[in-house]
């Protein structure tokens, strides 16, 4: 990984831990250039990408597809049910096969944490691996689009007060964001049910009472309650969660006029956030979705630059 002539070069993108501040800022600025229509990109040869999603996805899956098409890549959509995965083939052997067929980039989402380690450490797999989310582990492309959205608003990260609220333990978005936001100089707070907070977060910020810190925040980043990752009986009722931990209309009145509301989506309206606030003037949720395309264009460009530099 490196930055040369203003362009980031990546071999793979699996975790935010692997990225430097310079690389992150380079990707944000490149994504902004794609958004503004000022970025020049020339695909020098036919390039194939395949999107392997073993968990349901709307935003990540389709924004990667659109990003790939905007850059001129040939996209091989992958249906696990129609593939040899349904016959018992492993993810490793599936990627080994796609690599042998000539696929250059595999974007993968899996419920298995760290699935990518076996792939990137293989001597026989040469395609680039982009992690589209691994269980409760990491979600680097979501983190980067979140950072782009924050940077568009404030032009900095240093000194910003940011709360990440909700289902912390089960959230790969929280883990990716806390790592990089701390590195970029933001001051982090965590709020939500104490049962969904763990000691690993102590290295990055402070567990706080939401009502006490709301007036100080620059960014309130909400997280979806991930019922599919919970043990039975672990979840709250929708109304109970919203009243105790969600961004209600009354709580939103406590925010500074300059503060912004974020959510990686899908949004459970009336649970993490009041329905009326999802598209409110302070919300940047739709902007996050839009920025996902440009951020993923920047990621793919960096991967292609890394492959060319080898």
From Swiss-Prot:
Any GO BP: amino acid metabolic process
Cross-referenced PROSITE patterns: CARBAMOYLTRANSFERASE
Pfam families recorded: OTCace (PF00185), OTCace_N (PF02729)
Catalysed reactions, semicolon-separated: carbamoyl phosphate + L-aspartate = N-carbamoyl-L-aspartate + phosphate + H(+)
Gene Ontology molecular function: any one: amino acid binding
Binding-site residues, L-aspartate: 87, 172, 224
EC number: 2.1.3.2
Pathway as given in its UniProt record: Pyrimidine metabolism; UMP biosynthesis via de novo pathway; (S)-dihydroorotate from bicarbonate: step 2/3
Record-stated family: Belongs to the aspartate/ornithine carbamoyltransferase superfamily. ATCase family.
Record note on quaternary structure: Heterododecamer (2C3:3R2) of six catalytic PyrB chains organized as two trimers (C3), and six regulatory PyrI chains organized as three dimers (R2).
Family matches, as PANTHER family: ASPARTATE CARBAMOYLTRANSFERASE, ORNITHINE CARBAMOYLTRANSFERASE, MITOCHONDRIAL
Protein name: Aspartate carbamoyltransferase catalytic subunit
Species name: Lactococcus lactis subsp. lactis (strain IL1403) (Streptococcus lactis)
